[in-house]
Amino acid sequence: MTTAAKRVVSGMRPTGRLHLGHLVGALQNWEALQRQYDCFYFVADWHALTSHYSNTEAIVADAYDNVADWSAAGIDPAKSTVFVQSLVPEHAELYLLLQMVTPIPWLERVPTYKEQIDQMADRDLSNLGFLGYPLLQTADVIIYNAHYVPVGED
């Protein structure tokens, strides 16, 4: 398999305006990867709902702003597939199937679960969406048969 045939999948949560950290931490890498791989970059709006569910209007607005910023940073829709996660129903379908077969204690043992709860103590994160966040991440990766997944700390 050539590198051009290998697939990269990565997403970004629309939880505010992008800043220099996004450019240096992700977008410069994404821009370079699109020159040699089949790249799928998505607005992770369902991911944003797991912790920012009280302000859905901001998620929608930030999604549009973020995609415009991606374009300014060199993410080219002619070279990469750019999309909004919630507009692809198969994400929800696969996420649901993964929920049906994953024991809750496995999710409670995910190392970042308790760290994230501590870091976002100002929000009520006692919901299935937040607990099942790793399953949504899993669905994002396997639905596109990704070979590489550039990710952040979570």
Where are these regions (language model features)?
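N-terminal Rossmann-like or analogous alpha/beta NTP/dinucleotide-binding catalytic cores
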Residues: 2-138
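Inter-helical turn/loop segments and adjacent helix faces that build the functional surface
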Residues: 145-153
